[in-house]
Amino acid sequence: MKKLVTIFSLLAIMLFSISTAFAANEKITMMDEDYNLKNIHTLAIYTPSYKPSALSIERKAKLPNAPELITPDMLTEVIFKVAKEDEVTYTLLSDKDVIQNITIATGTDITTLSNREALAIYKENIKNYADAYVIFTFANDSRVVMFADVYDAKDNHWICSYQIIGGDTEDDNLENYSMFMHKFFRTLTIQSQK
């Protein structure tokens, strides 16, 4: 009986240590320590930068029942869903709303421009619609990684950078990105309460 208890104890310790070793690694860096995150009442979401992993593309090509490839629009939907679940205290603006407002105000449809030109016009006009904006970037190499850079809309000053690196077992799917975004919004909320 004693040996059985010892074996189960060792097994439990081993399982907890394995899950900790493969857990996602996250880091937030405040670029401007003087900026008060409580000043953010409206946060605009810029179109996420995302490219499917080679493994996802290969699966889609070879397997008939493979999951659908993720698109930036799908990621934007997840961002809004997660923000609603986490009950964030600020208003979120979608990239489509901001782009539509910029098109009406300037007469320029930035979706027809190159990324560089579109971002320049976006940065020039975002101050009219939001207090800050966030640019999400997703990388899919050997590990799934999400970056979120938050900028002040008034002067495009870099406020903070958030990075989360998935563990070895994380895959290129919406469930993982949803988990990453929950962590991002919770971290942003905690930082704003400091």
What are these regions (language model features)?
Residues M1-F8:
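Bacterial N-terminal signal peptides that target proteins for export
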Residues K3, P48, D95-D97:
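Histidine- and/or cysteine-centered catalytic micro-motif in compact active-site loops
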Residues F8-S17:
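Bacterial N-terminal signal peptides
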Residues A23-A44, Y50-L55, E87, A120-Y129, ...:
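C-terminal/domain-edge helix-coil "capping" segments
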Residues A54-A118:
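N-terminal segment of the mature soluble domain
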Residues A132-V134:
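Well-ordered beta-strand positions
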